[in-house]
Design a protein with these regions (language model features):
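Metal-cofactor-binding active-site regions of metalloenzymes
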Residues: 1-115
Length: 115
């Protein structure tokens, strides 16, 4: 058990799309028929990048696997479940409708997935 689990926490700035775990990323990639290069993963549980430019490049690759409102729903649930397990009681999540729009989602369907 993590010794800080008993302390209530706040996540005051997080980009929802950036919370996707490598496991969920691989799952969405398979489901949405997106081929991913294994060099984006440092391990089963982490991503790998060399510098900020590489981070942004790989962030865009990772977010490219999110295609549907259902993907956003699963991503949101997964992230908030992890927050609850770590006693995070307050979250200010930033969401990017730009990624959703690039995949053909309307703003309304995107929000339905997140909410």
């Amino acid at each position: 058990m993590n010794s800080t689990n008993h302390i209530p926490k706040a996540e005051i700035h997080v980009h929802l799309e950036a919370t996707i775990s490598p496991e969920l990323c691989r799952k969405f990639a398979k489901r949405n028929k997106v081929t991913l290069s294994e060099d984006i993963f440092g391990s089963r549980y982490a991503y790998a990048w060399d510098d900020f430019y590489d981070f942004i490049k790989k962030y865009d690759i990772v977010t490219s696997v999110i295609h549907t409102p259902e993907d956003y729903k699963e991503l949101t649930y997964s992230y908030l479940k992890e927050c609850a397990a770590n006693n995070v009681i307050y979250v200010e999540a930033m969401i990017s409708s730009t990624h959703a729009k690039q995949k053909g989602m309307s703003y309304h369907s995107f929000l339905e997935g997140v909410i």
